[in-house]
Amino acid sequence: MRKINFFDTTLRDGEQSPGVNLNTQEKLAIAKQLERLGADIIEAGFPASSRGDFLAVQEIARTIKNCSVTGLARCVKGDIDAAWEALKDGAQPRIHVFIATSDIHLKHKLKMTREQVIERAVGMVKYAKERFPIVQWSAEDACRTELPFLAEIVEKVIDAGASVINLPDTVGYLAPAEYGNIFKYMKENVPNIHKAKLSAHCHDDLGMAVANSLAAIENGADQIECAVNGIGERAGNAALEEIAVALHTRKDFYQVETGITLNEIKRTSDLVSKLTGMAVPRNKAVVGDNAFAHESGIHQDGFLKEKSTYEIISPELVGVTADALVLGKHSGRHAFKDRLTALGFQFDSEEINKFFTMFKELTEKKKEITDEDLVSLILEEKVTDRKIGYEFLSLQVHYGTSQVPTATLSLKNQENAQLIQEAATGAGSVEAIYNTLERCIDKDVELLDYRIQSNRKGEDAFAQVYVRVLVNGKESAGRGIAQDVLEASAKAYLNAVNRQLVFQSNMSGLKNHTAVGS
């Protein structure tokens, strides 16, 4: 049975979602989970784009062993050199080079002729092949490229050494039949097509990314590029979880197999949602809260009599289970460690001791500690970048029906260890906190979105707050986790500000980090 490779671009195209700025530790946490999920290739970033991206790709390449790590590069020597330096220590290094091929891109963006684009693509594939054992080449905006020209350039880059050809629907324009026809045309009109795998990369601007990806598979694609939860630029990418489950559930139709470990899907989805701050819609296929809910009386009656009447996939298939194991104040170190292992975390004894101490402190405040609580506890500690920005120390809020809400905050500037204390009022408690924080950090911050989410039912549940803000005109997303919703609100605001400061720091080092060649 033909195997479909999954090329995950959550950390590259997915991170290009507005307001998403992941630090290196967050990217590494997602990469490790993608490895457990069974992704064949992880596109870890665009090494030439910034110092931060370069370092993140390098760290991921050095850490991941069971799948291939790749980086994006333009058909430019400087990009390829940066990608090699970032990826060369990886277990299975490969590169993803691209250049636009549609006439609209050639005329308005590249200012190049078709002949010049072919020459550049062939030359840079050869250059990349001198370093990388596997070179993937992409025809940006392939969906609006005339098919005879697309076939011509595909043939020539395969001759130059490309062993994977990606034909993206960059703007999410085509219908499934049209997109599938591109792959059929390449199979029938490129003489050396047997020397390369065909890859599909679909955007969801018209809501057809998953359908188009499946159409590509029907017409000969061997690789699908996708992102967890379908995140990405504009309306996003094809959702990894939807494609994987569709191919599994309808194996009778598609006659293909994948290496995806399906019961890791829900855990992966939750991790990406938490770290990016992008909530999963309740009605989202496969991983939404309502994916396995039945409201209609007729549906409920049929489901209770026989699940298969209205349920084509089981929750357990994708890792959703109702049997939640809870820990408490009497749980020992061994049970704690076993639970972390079951959740996919691997720590040394020193880290286990640190997290166990934090766990015990938490049990003094909460009677039952769920998996969600453990994940929140570890992510908050493990993936926080503590070198740049501000550290939350303490918060006091005075509020009553006849009082003006007043917040007092203490922060530490992590670059110079300066203690900062301020107080301010507001129309409500959250506004008072945010007014105080704006005074503390001396930045122009505008709140765009504010959302509260609970880990579970119960009065002692953790609150998770997600915010989107403009920091000096640049959008950033942040999350905060705490038992107290006001503390979580303060942490979310600070997290968003810190992400933007990290991003600015990474970009400031770009010029000294890599030179763009030709």
From Swiss-Prot:
Cofactor: Mn(2+)
Enzyme nomenclature, EC number: 2.3.3.13
Predominant localisation class: cytoplasm
The keyword Transferase appears for this protein: yes
Residues at which Mn(2+) binds: 13, 201, 203, 237
Catalyzed reaction equations: 3-methyl-2-oxobutanoate + acetyl-CoA + H2O = (2S)-2-isopropylmalate + CoA + H(+)
Quaternary structure and partners: Homodimer.
Record's keyword terms, sorted: Amino-acid biosynthesis, Branched-chain amino acid biosynthesis, Cytoplasm, Leucine biosynthesis, Manganese, Metal-binding, Transferase
Sequence similarity: Belongs to the alpha-IPM synthase/homocitrate synthase family. LeuA type 1 subfamily.
One Gene Ontology term of the molecular function aspect: acetyl-CoA C-acetyltransferase activity
Role, per record: Catalyzes the condensation of the acetyl group of acetyl-CoA with 3-methyl-2-oxobutanoate (2-ketoisovalerate) to form 3-carboxy-3-hydroxy-4-methylpentanoate (2-isopropylmalate).
Swiss-Prot/TrEMBL GO biological process terms: L-leucine biosynthetic process
Lineage: Bacteria, Bacillati, Bacillota, Bacilli, Bacillales
HAMAP family noted in UniProt: LeuA_type1 (MF_01025)
Ranges where the Pyruvate carboxyltransferase domain occurs: 4-266
Any Pfam family hit: HMGL-like
Protein name as it appears in the record: 2-isopropylmalate synthase
Ranges in coiled-coil conformation: none
Xref: PROSITE patterns: AIPM_HOMOCIT_SYNTH_1 (PS00815), AIPM_HOMOCIT_SYNTH_2 (PS00816), PYR_CT (PS50991)
Record pathway: Amino-acid biosynthesis; L-leucine biosynthesis; L-leucine from 3-methyl-2-oxobutanoate: step 1/4
Localization: Cytoplasm
Region (Regulatory domain): 391-518
